[in-house]
């Protein structure tokens, strides 16, 4: 009995659920219902999406074209109906006799539409036509994909049209009230203008109402057209300013400019024109499209600014003095006639997404954070995902270039001051960098050094110049067609624009007889352009002897560099006590010291020079590179074959500044830069510039100067002063004379003259032959041979231990 009762009780408890379990069950049912409804919504959205995707693209375009044409037809119909409105036609606002012929060009329907519009809004009904034209134009531009900005906002335009059709009739009523009663159903302003105008006049008065209405109308018009009045006024102001500047420039040129008169430095009339062109090119902030398909942040874009031109504010009215040297002016160079290549933000965004997707295919996760666009390339800065090594991305440079269908991709593993990497891609449109852009920039005009050289523009489009005095020597390498020779020409031209022949002198060695021969005859040269490699050795010997001579002068004057020496000479001359030459050939009447010019040795092709005069050239270049900086002697050494047998360790170790254009292999890139990268450049001036003490090179686009421009500048410089060569510099006479000044004790041995005569007559340069001829010991013969080398009679020993005779018998 008890057992049965327990079973019933348990059954009863199981059959009647508790309140808590009922509530839980209810909640579960509600959650299930929500999930079902969410799934149904997702299915419906998916069906809509699939329906849209299933619709062919040409059908969508056809529907869009049809709607646009229908809107155009409706606008034209409304316009002709308003134009041909006649008060005698049947209308809604007043009764009229039944006529068979309706005067309105839109027919009976057009007459009714025009009557209703004019009755309600007066002439302000034409705002509907204006709004329709704006909408049609914006949609046409958007449909034709001629703009990269946001789509036209129709909701804002509708709100602006509503405000215009309310406030414009009020303005019309206040200004033209009572007029056009015979032409319009209720006169100017329509019923809206009459009713709303009465309210405004009662609340604010007529003057206050006009002020408020004008402000509202301007704002509404701005929203309808979707332009900024501030930008419009700013652009109008710039146009007026440019016009006034051009007019004032012409007036100043007519009033001040004299015939057949040129000014030093920058040509004013020419630079004003450059300023005018530069002002018309305004750099606006780049707005990237919203709603990117990727979930990453938008790419920050940096655009190369237009070049800033350094302008001389006042022209030089002082007449020239006869025989005075004047530097060339910028009107001898070609001004760039092309505007900076416009940046397409949408294209940058697409490229950034492409970089991320292509690297993701190789299992590398990155995020593009910014992009900097220059004249030739665009650098995309990327943040690698956690655990991704930079070397992994660098190793994919060729694969990335292939997958993106590009000529080359350069990956910068480290960017100074940032935790990002750089991927440099070539631009679709290449922009030339002209030499005149660099020479007219403030950074070049404000440089004080006479050895300032124009290098080009960096990755952001900023002009870059270098100071050869601080480098103090430059090694340039690049294959044929890379722009190496053009870059060297640009450097020489920069110094011609910056310095007079009294300040800078050149020695040019051109084995190819093509690149530097154009400068033959300019007053800056110390000797004719050297094309014979045997004479090149003599020229370098003279440079070494001149370096030693200058060091002795600096030591005697108690200064540390050539600049200090020239300042001391100038100060002594100004005080009336000029310094005398302590190493004069006439000790009884020494000549006064003069300021010494800087000397730049330009070697266009080192490889050919090393093949013919390897031992002597390598030693002389190494000696100059080690010691010549303080003496004011600097070198620009160029080669198209930067292999280890040309750019030897001895030369490379003493020239820390390097500039690499496109080279053929990674080995050549390592030779010139100690790292890869130069083999991935784009030719035609694309280069890497490695400064002393810098681990990472700077990518530059070299400045271009044409042969015609070089000819014009050279002809101008020749017309200013004749060539002033040092006699005997290439024959060894000048080197021998300089060596005697440097080492006056070289002939202290009583047998020195006999040794010179024997070497020049017998053509034998060995120590043993000199020992046998003069019947002296080996040590004395070796000292005499060393004295002959220091005096410039014989060269140093080559790889075989032999010497060459540098002097001639006539020197005796």
Curated annotation (Swiss-Prot):
Composition bias, Basic and acidic residues: 25-36
PROSITE patterns: FTSK
Segments crossing the lipid bilayer: 63-83, 116-136, 156-176, 184-204, 210-230
Superkingdom classification of source: Bacteria
Residues in compartment: Cytoplasmic: 231-812
Ranges where the FtsK domain occurs: 461-670
Start-end of Basic residues biased regions: 1-11
Keywords: ATP-binding, Cell cycle, Cell division, Cell inner membrane, Cell membrane, Chromosome partition, DNA-binding, Membrane, Nucleotide-binding, Transmembrane, Transmembrane helix
Binding site for ATP: 481-486
Record's bilayer topology term: Multi-pass membrane protein
Subcellular compartments: Cell inner membrane
One Gene Ontology term from the biological process aspect of the record: cell division
Pfam families: FtsK_4TM, FtsK_alpha, FtsK_gamma, FtsK_SpoIIIE
Region (Disordered): 1-36
GO-annotated molecular function: ATP binding; DNA binding; DNA translocase activity
Principal location listed in the UniProt entry: membrane
GO cellular component, one term: plasma membrane
Family statement: Belongs to the FtsK/SpoIIIE/SftA family.
Domain note: Consists of an N-terminal domain, which is sufficient for the localization to the septal ring and is required for cell division, followed by a linker domain, and a C-terminal domain, which forms the translocation motor involved in chromosome segregation. The C-terminal domain can be further subdivided into alpha, beta and gamma subdomains. The alpha and beta subdomains multimerise to produce a hexameric ring, contain the nucleotide binding motif and form the DNA pump.
Job description of the protein: Essential cell division protein that coordinates cell division and chromosome segregation. The N-terminus is involved in assembly of the cell-division machinery. The C-terminus functions as a DNA motor that moves dsDNA in an ATP-dependent manner towards the dif recombination site, which is located within the replication terminus region. Translocation stops specifically at Xer-dif sites, where FtsK interacts with the Xer recombinase, allowing activation of chromosome unlinking by recombination. FtsK orienting polar sequences (KOPS) guide the direction of DNA translocation.
Assembly information from the UniProt record: Homohexamer. Forms a ring that surrounds DNA.
Protein name: DNA translocase FtsK 1
Organism: Neisseria meningitidis serogroup B (strain ATCC BAA-335 / MC58)
Lineage: Bacteria, Pseudomonadati, Pseudomonadota, Betaproteobacteria, Neisseriales
């Amino acid at each position: 009995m008890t057992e049965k009762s327990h079973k019933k009780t348990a059954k009863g408890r199981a059959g009647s659920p508790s309140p808590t379990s009922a509530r839980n069950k209810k909640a579960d049912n509600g959650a299930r219902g929500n999930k079902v409804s969410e799934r149904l919504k997702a299915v419906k959205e998916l069906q809509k999406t699939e329906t849209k995707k299933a619709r062919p693209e040409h059908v969508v375009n056809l529907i869009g074209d049809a709607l646009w044409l229908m809107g155009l037809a409706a606008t034209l119909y409304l316009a002709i109906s308003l134009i041909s409105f006649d008060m005698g036609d049947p209308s809604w606002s007043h009764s009229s006799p039944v006529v068979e012929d309706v005067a309105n060009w839109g027919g009976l329907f057009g007459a009714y539409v025009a009557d209703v519009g004019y009755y309600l809004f007066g002439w302000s009904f034409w705002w509907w036509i204006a709004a329709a034209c704006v909408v049609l134009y914006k949609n046409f531009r958007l449909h034709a994909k001629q703009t990269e900005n946001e789509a036209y906002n129709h909701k804002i335009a509708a709100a602006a049209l509503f405000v215009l059709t309310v406030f414009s009739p009020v303005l019309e009523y206040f200004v033209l009230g009572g007029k056009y009663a015979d032409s319009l159903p209720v006169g100017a302003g329509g019923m809206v203008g009459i009713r709303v105008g009465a309210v405004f006049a009662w609340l604010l008065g007529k003057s206050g109402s006009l002020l408020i209405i004008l402000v509202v109308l301007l704002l509404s018009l701005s929203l309808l057209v979707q332009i900024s009045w501030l930008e419009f006024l700013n652009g109008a102001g710039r146009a007026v300013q440019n016009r006034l500047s051009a007019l004032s420039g012409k007036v100043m040129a007519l009033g001040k400019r004299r015939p057949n008169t040129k000014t030093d430095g920058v040509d004013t009339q020419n630079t004003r024109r450059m300023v005018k062109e530069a002002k018309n090119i305004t750099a606006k902030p780049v707005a990237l499209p919203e709603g990117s398909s990727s979930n990453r942040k938008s790419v920050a874009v940096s655009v190369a600014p237009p070049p800033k031109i350094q302008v001389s504010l006042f022209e030089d009215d002082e007449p020239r003095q006869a025989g005075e040297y004047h530097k060339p002016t910028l009107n001898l160079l070609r001004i760039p006639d092309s505007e900076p290549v416009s940046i397409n933000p949408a294209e940058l965004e697409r490229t950034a997404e492409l970089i991320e997707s292509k690297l993701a295919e190789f299992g590398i996760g990155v995020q593009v954070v910014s992009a900097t666009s220059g004249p030739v390339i665009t650098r995309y800065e990327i943040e690698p995902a956690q655990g991704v090594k930079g070397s992994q991305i660098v190793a994919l440079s060729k694969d990335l270039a292939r997958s993106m269908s590009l000529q080359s991709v350069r990956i910068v593993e480290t960017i100074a001051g940032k935790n990002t990497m750089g991927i440099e891609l070539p631009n679709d449109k290449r922009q030339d960098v002209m030499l005149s852009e660099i020479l007219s920039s403030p950074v070049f005009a404000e440089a004080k050094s006479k050895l300032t050289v124009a290098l080009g523009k960096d990755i952001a489009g900023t002009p870059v110049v270098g100071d050869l005095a601080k480098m103090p020597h430059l090694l340039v390498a690049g294959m044929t067609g890379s722009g190496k020779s053009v870059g060297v020409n640009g450097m020489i031209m920069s110094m011609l624009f910056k310095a007079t022949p009294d300040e800078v002198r050149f020695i040019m060695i051109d084995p190819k007889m093509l690149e530097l021969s154009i400068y033959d005859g300019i007053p800056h040269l110390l000797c004719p352009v050297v094309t014979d490699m045997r004479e090149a050795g003599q020229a370098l010997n003279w440079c070494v002897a001149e370096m030693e001579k200058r060091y002795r002068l600096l030591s005697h004057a108690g200064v540390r560099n050539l600049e200090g020496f020239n300042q001391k000479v100038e100060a002594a001359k100004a005080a009336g006590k000029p310094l005398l030459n302590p190493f004069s050939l006439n000790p009884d009447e020494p000549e006064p010291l003069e300021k010494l010019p800087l000397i730049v040795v330009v070697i266009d092709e080192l490889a050919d020079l090393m093949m013919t005069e390897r031992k002597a050239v390598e030693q002389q270049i190494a000696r100059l590179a080690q010691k010549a900086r303080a003496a004011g002697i600097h070198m620009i050494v160029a080669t198209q074959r930067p292999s280890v047998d040309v750019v030897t360790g001895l030369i490379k170790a003493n020239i820390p500044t390097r500039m690499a254009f496109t080279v053929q292999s990674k080995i050549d890139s390592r030779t010139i830069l100690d790292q890869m990268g130069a083999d991935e450049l784009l030719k035609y001036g694309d280069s890497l510039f490695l400064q002393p003490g810098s681990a990472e090179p700077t990518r530059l686009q070299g400045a271009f100067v044409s042969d015609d421009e070089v000819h014009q500048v050279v002809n101008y410089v020749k017309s200013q002063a004749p060539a002033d060569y040092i006699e005997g510099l290439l024959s060894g006479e000048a080197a021998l004379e300089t060596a005697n000044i440097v080492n006056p004790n070289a002939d202290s041995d009583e047998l020195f003259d006999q040794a010179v005569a024997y070497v020049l007559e017998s053509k034998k340069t060995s120590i043993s032959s000199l020992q046998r001829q003069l019947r002296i010991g080996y040590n004395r013969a070796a000292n005499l041979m060393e004295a002959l080398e220091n005096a410039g009679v014989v060269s140093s020993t080559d790889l075989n231990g032999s010497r060459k005779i540098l002097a001639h018998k006539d020197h005796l």
